[in-house]
């Protein structure tokens, strides 16, 4: 006899999700930064990336987003929160004039901890993001990926994203990590 899998879905994040988002974000961010550096994070950087500090930011984002175009989503399996994503209008200064890049949605975060990976949660989050981008009449989606984050690079490349040709560096005290901007053009509504 086989056991049915619990329901998996994506929904808008709610305030009671905040502690989970803070924990998840701290864990995934520390791991990604350490991998990009090739060594442990400097103590002062690690001390800033606490679950509590990140949860405060997510609480503000959920309870008082700057506009309706800012969204935070939660992936749920059964009753457990297993991932999250956040989107906002892209910073036009990074991608050029608005008339050259109308309606670009930036994926600020799309995180599924390794222990919940490979179950479709990331794909469900990305599909929900694409639906919101379509509602907002966006023509592109973009995301910043740290050089060396092969899993995230493969995920977004497999979803049709490609390098935009823009990068930025983050100084972490004992080293610098580089992020590359990846993007995809959305199919026009029929």
Per-segment meaning from a language model:
Residues 113-115, 119, 147-148:
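Active-site acidic-Proline motif in GNAT/NAT acetyltransferases
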Residues 24, 136, 158-159:
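Structural motif
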Residues 3, 12-15, 26-36, 44-115, ...:
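Acetyl-CoA-dependent GNAT
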Residues 143-153, 171-173:
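Conserved beta-strand-loop-alpha-helix junction that forms the acyl-donor binding cleft
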Residues 156-166:
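Conserved acetyl-CoA-binding loop of GNAT-fold acetyltransferases
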């Amino acid at each position: 006899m086989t056991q049915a899998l619990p329901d998996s879905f994506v929904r808008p994040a709610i305030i009671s999700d905040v502690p989970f988002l803070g924990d998840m974000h701290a864990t995934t961010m520390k791991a990604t930064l350490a991998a990009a550096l090739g060594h442990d994070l400097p103590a002062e950087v690690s001390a800033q990336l606490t679950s509590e500090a990140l949860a405060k930011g997510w609480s503000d984002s959920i309870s008082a987003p700057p506009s309706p175009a800012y969204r935070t989503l939660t992936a749920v399996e059964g009753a457990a929160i297993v991932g999250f994503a956040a989107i906002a209008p892209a910073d036009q200064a990074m991608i050029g004039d608005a008339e050259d890049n109308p309606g670009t949605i930036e994926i600020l975060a799309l995180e599924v901890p390794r222990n919940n990976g490979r179950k479709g949660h990331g794909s469900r989050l990305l599909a929900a993001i694409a639906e919101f981008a379509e509602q907002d009449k966006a023509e592109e989606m973009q995301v910043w990926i740290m050089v060396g984050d092969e899993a995230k690079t493969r995920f977004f490349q497999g979803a049709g994203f490609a390098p935009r040709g823009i990068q930025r560096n983050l100084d972490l005290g004992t080293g610098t990590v580089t992020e590359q901007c990846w993007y995809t053009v959305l199919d026009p509504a029929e």
